[in-house]
A protein has these predicted regions:
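Active-site glycine- and acidic-residue-rich loops that bind
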Residues: 93-103
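A short helix->loop->beta-strand "cap" motif at the edges of active sites that frequently abuts
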Residues: 36, 111-113, 161
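A short alpha/beta connector and helix-capping loop motif
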Residues: 66, 102-138
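Rossmann-like AdoMet/SAM-dependent catalytic core
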Residues: 1-12, 17, 27, 34, ...
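Structured loop/turn residues at beta-strand edges in well-structured enzyme cores
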Residues: 11, 87, 110
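Short amphipathic alpha-helix with an adjacent loop that forms part of the alpha/beta core around
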Residues: 76-86, 105-108
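SAM cofactor-binding core of SAM-dependent methyltransferases
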Residues: 1-82, 91-94, 121-124
């Protein structure tokens, strides 16, 4: 997989932080299987309880903290840096389907080696769009959520990260700290853009694009 390939190249201390997960599927699962330690954070208490049970059953001796909390601009840096026993976060994953752009903008990423974040594929490849910051935002699969790949790439470029991979499924993008960028091909967000839209019916896609066009929740950044 992409993560495994990246960490064959990027040095690491086997430490991760992942924000936003499903108990049955998340980006750090294979890292945990390999003995990595870290934090898993999600706002959904049911997901947190289910994941704790799964991890305790299958991986009894792991050093993974599962935290139930809402991610906000005012608490993100404290959550990420608190009690971390290493100077670096080797793998940081963000997928909250809402204020992702604003969380990344606020977060100190200087000690992150590799970053993965979900982008809103419905927003296309050419516009720098994100939803306005809204602590009460609730995700709906209507196209109105998160940020475009171009917006995230430009934001992270200003934080010394480069785009090096995009999942073929059109879900996640991977960025590397510029300390390691010479080891990879740096990608263009417009040329590497992928979309999940092919899995939706024509009527559903038409509805989603209409929602996006009419929404007052997006802003250009």
């Amino acid at each position: 997989g992409i993560i495994e390939h990246i960490f064959k190249i990027v040095p690491n201390t086997m430490h991760f932080v992942e924000i936003g997960f499903g108990y049955y599927e998340f980006n750090s699962m294979n890292l945990i299987k390999k003995g990595w330690s870290g934090k898993l954070i999600d706002v959904d208490n049911d997901e947190v309880i289910a994941l704790k049970k799964n991890l305790n059953h299958y991986y009894k001796n792991i050093k993974v903290e599962v935290i139930n909390t809402k991610i906000l601009k005012k608490n993100i840096n404290e959550l990420i840096t608190e009690k971390i026993q290493t100077n670096w976060i080797d793998f940081f994953s963000l997928d909250i389907d809402s204020n992702d752009y604003w969380v990344l903008e606020t977060l100190d990423l200087s000690k992150v080696r590799v970053l993965c974040c979900e982008y809103n594929h419905w927003l296309g490849s050419e516009r720098k769009l994100t939803i306005k910051y809204n602590e009460d935002f609730k995700f709906k699969d209507n196209g109105v959520w998160g940020a475009s790949l171009l917006a995230l790439t430009e934001l992270l470029k200003n934080k010394n990260f480069s785009l090096i991979a995009v999942e073929s499924s059109g879900t996640n993008a991977f960025f590397v700290n510029n300390k390691y960028k010479d080891k990879f091909e740096v990608l263009s967000p417009s040329k590497s853009f992928r979309s999940v839209g092919r899995f939706y019916s024509a009527d559903k896609k038409k509805e989603i694009y209409k929602n996006i066009k009419q929404s007052k929740l997006f802003i250009e950044v």
